[in-house]
């Protein structure tokens, strides 16, 4: 769920997720349209696509089983919740892997600037 996703992002990036990612670019946060602005925004686009493929549970609110030490390990018997966990894990790792190209100009980015045709998942 969103609270667990926040913890994963914080663990992987050492950044406060709400500040750094909740309103970043065209796809981070609620909704999304246009073309991703950079690699970090693409992480959010791919995460949105991943959530679209989830069936059988609500990705944003259902709790899943996972552990975090040096890496994130998704567990539990519920295949839907495990899939959500894997979506969140992939995005958190993607954010970490793209920290060097993170652009502050895309923080709190007004989505009315996201006018390019939207990409398909």
Curated annotation (Swiss-Prot):
Record key words, sorted: Blood coagulation cascade inhibiting toxin, Calcium, Disulfide bond, Hemostasis impairing toxin, Hydrolase, Lipid degradation, Lipid metabolism, Metal-binding, Myotoxin, Phosphoprotein, Secreted, Toxin
Keyword Lipid metabolism assigned: yes
SMART domains found in the cross-reference section: PA2c (SM00085)
GO terms of molecular function: calcium ion binding; calcium-dependent phospholipase A2 activity; phospholipid binding; toxin activity
Cofactor(s) the record lists: Ca(2+)
Localization, UniProt: Secreted
Cysteine pairs bridged by disulfides in the record: 26-114, 28-44, 43-94, 49-121, 50-87, 57-80, 74-85
Principal place of residence: secreted
Pfam families per record: Phospholip_A2_1
Tagged with keyword Lipid metabolism: yes
InterPro entries registered for this protein in UniProt: PLipase_A2 (IPR001211), PLipase_A2_Asp_AS (IPR033112), PLipase_A2_dom (IPR016090), PLipase_A2_dom_sf (IPR036444), PLipase_A2_His_AS (IPR033113)
Its EC number(s): 3.1.1.4
Entry GO CC: extracellular region
Tissue expression per record: Expressed by the venom gland.
GO BP: any one term: lipid catabolic process
Similarity remark: Belongs to the phospholipase A2 family. Group I subfamily. D49 sub-subfamily.
Role this protein plays: Snake venom phospholipase A2 (PLA2) that displays moderate myotoxic activity in vivo, and cytotoxic activity in vitro. In vitro, shows anticoagulant activity on human plasma and in mice causes inflammatory cell infiltration and myonecrosis in the gastrocnemius muscles of CD-1 mice 3 hours after injection (100 ug). PLA2 catalyzes the calcium-dependent hydrolysis of the 2-acyl groups in 3-sn-phosphoglycerides.
Protein name, entry field: Basic phospholipase A2
Species annotation: Porthidium ophryomegas (Slender hognose viper)
């Amino acid at each position: 769920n969103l609270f667990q996703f926040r913890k994963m992002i914080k663990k992987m990036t050492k950044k406060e997720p709400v500040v750094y990612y909740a309103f970043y670019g065209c796809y981070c946060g609620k909704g999304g349209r246009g073309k991703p602005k950079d690699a970090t925004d693409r992480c959010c686009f791919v995460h949105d696509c991943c959530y679209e493929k989830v069936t059988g549970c609500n990705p944003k609110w259902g709790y899943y089983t996972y552990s975090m030490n040096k890496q994130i390990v998704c567990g539990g018997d519920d295949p839907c919740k495990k899939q959500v966990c894997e979506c969140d894990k992939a995005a958190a790792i993607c954010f970490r892997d793209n920290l060097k190209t993170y652009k502050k100009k895309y923080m709190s980015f007004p989505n009315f600037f996201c006018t390019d045709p939207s990409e398909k998942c």
